[in-house]
């Protein structure tokens, strides 16, 4: 297994699909990485030479991925909560942030129903 950005990339998958196993790299970005390195998208990771894998590592290193990206997202949400913005309050209360209705639905964010005690 090739190791890129601290993640074991699956050998049996095509390069474009395998790169998406890294947090922060989706299909479009993985296609751009393949184009920049000159590696065909339909080549499997196991068929790549060590030199090609090094090229992929260098290209992926240009982006914010994995732990750094997770930390960045967490800090931006924490910043919203500290500022006391509306979005921060919604995050703190565990409610939908982007204006969805909450009278019905929103069960994923709100959690299981709490029965009314008589």
Curated annotation (Swiss-Prot):
Q: Which UniProt keywords apply?
A: Ribonucleoprotein, Ribosomal protein, RNA-binding, rRNA-binding, tRNA-binding
Give GO terms: molecular function aspect only.
rRNA binding; structural constituent of ribosome; tRNA binding
- Transmembrane segments annotated in the record for this chain: none
InterPro entries (UniProt xref)? Rbsml_uS13_C, Ribosomal_uS13, Ribosomal_uS13-like_H2TH, Ribosomal_uS13_bac-type, Ribosomal_uS13_CS
Please give the residue ranges the record annotates as the region Disordered.
92-118
Q: Which GO terms describe its biological process?
A: translation
- Family to which this protein belongs: Belongs to the universal ribosomal protein uS13 family.
Q: What does this protein do?
A: Located at the top of the head of the 30S subunit, it contacts several helices of the 16S rRNA. In the 70S ribosome it contacts the 23S rRNA (bridge B1a) and protein L5 of the 50S subunit (bridge B1b), connecting the 2 subunits; these bridges are implicated in subunit movement. Contacts the tRNAs in the A and P-sites.
Tell me how this protein assembles. Part of the 30S ribosomal subunit. Forms a loose heterodimer with protein S19. Forms two bridges to the 50S subunit in the 70S ribosome.
What protein am I looking at?
Small ribosomal subunit protein uS13
Q: Which organism is it from?
A: Pectobacterium carotovorum subsp. carotovorum (strain PC1)
Name the lineage: Bacteria, Pseudomonadati, Pseudomonadota, Gammaproteobacteria, Enterobacterales
